[in-house]
Amino acid sequence: MKTLILLIQFFTRIPLPVQINMDEINLKKGSALLPFVGVIIGAWNWLIFTLVALLMPLPVAIIAGLFAEIIITGGFHVDALADTADGLFSSRKRERMLEIMKDSRVGANGVIAICFYFLFYGSLFLSVPDTQQIGWLFFVLPIVAKGVTMLLFAKMTYAGSKAGLGSIFLGVPWWPVVIAQVIVLVALGLFFSYIGVIAYAGVILFTIIYRAFVYKRIGGMNGDTLGAGGQMGQLICLFCLVLLWGLI
């Protein structure tokens, strides 16, 4: 329970008035619980979307659902997406890329990445004809994001500062990664049947390509690239689901 509370405090803005000593927790092994943080985020997103959808048109409800995640996470990973885009597409050397990612200012690449991310994300949601299914997507996709993050933890080389937040998860063993993937697959299977499982295969393929690209650019992961990977992973999952629903 302490591990889950610590993960909630780490990845969300939920005010839990509990002080936990990091020395008492093996966060690397406890990272298997990370998808359950996605469950909490997803439940919040689903609730906000569902309530707004009762009163407002569907596009407004979708925007509310997207904004709900920013509220509960503080835009933690959206900021990481912007920093990653600014750094990796800066056409600079490795050291300079890492410096750019640390910069609190958002550059042109970051703004473009965020704009296209939400435009594409919102368009994909609008492509789903069933309102109830959109609600389930708001619930499940944050779980997928945490599954992708766990995949990126596997045998991770850390490129950022050793004092960086992502370094806490350096050396995560394989078994928490596997457990996290099982949780994600169960969630996708329960809500979207075999199509959800097939869609996650596309997410895994994306994760492999993304990981290789990041390692080639900066030699490993850091907090920003980990957060960006999770954000893009849930976008890719939604894309694969919409594509499969259109084909089948």
From Swiss-Prot:
The keyword Cell inner membrane does not apply. Its EC number is 2.7.8.26. It is an enzyme of class 2 (transferase). One of its GO terms (molecular function) is cobalamin 5'-phosphate synthase activity. Pathway: Cofactor biosynthesis; adenosylcobalamin biosynthesis; adenosylcobalamin from cob(II)yrinate a,c-diamide: step 7/7. Its cofactor is Mg(2+). Joins adenosylcobinamide-GDP and alpha-ribazole to generate adenosylcobalamin (Ado-cobalamin). Also synthesizes adenosylcobalamin 5'-phosphate from adenosylcobinamide-GDP and alpha-ribazole 5'-phosphate. This is Adenosylcobinamide-GDP ribazoletransferase. The gene is cobS.
